[in-house]
Amino acid sequence: TSISAALGLAVARDLEQKDNTVVAVIGDGALSGGMAYEALNNLSILRKEKKNMIIILNDNKMSISENVGGMSRYLNDLRSRRSYSEFKENVENALNNIPGVGKSVARTLKKSKDSIKQLFIPGMLFENMGITYYGLVNGHDIYELIHAINRAKQHEGPILIHAITRKGMGYKN
């Protein structure tokens, strides 16, 4: 229901000619339900008018019952690419430790990689539905999340931020 409710809020925002940002947060378990697909399909309302709405997919591979179906398989495939993310972090760390030019080279490679990733990799399902895909984002890195949300706020049309999280890594008292 989060995406449906957010879509309603976004339409109301636009009718009232306001410019606030509407954000829906949905878990990977809930995304495999029919109501979520219906809402994703209806986002065409925002696509046509280039109106913004952000969806944050909290992907922790956890739900009350086992996830089944195409969306579950699709998300599992994306998660399995985590080894790629670890490799990427190791390369970035190595580059950042090169005196003088390392940080500049790392930044340039990261920008290039992000551009290529946005074009070809995991979010093609969402892209095919007209929803811009931004991910994979470390859901435990507040600065990475803030950066992703700020980029998403500048986007015209619906955008999904795919945040990978792990149970037990949340708020500590």
Regions found by a protein language model. Name each.
Residues 1-58:
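Thiamine diphosphate
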Residues 60-173:
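Long, well-ordered, tryptophan-enriched scaffold segments
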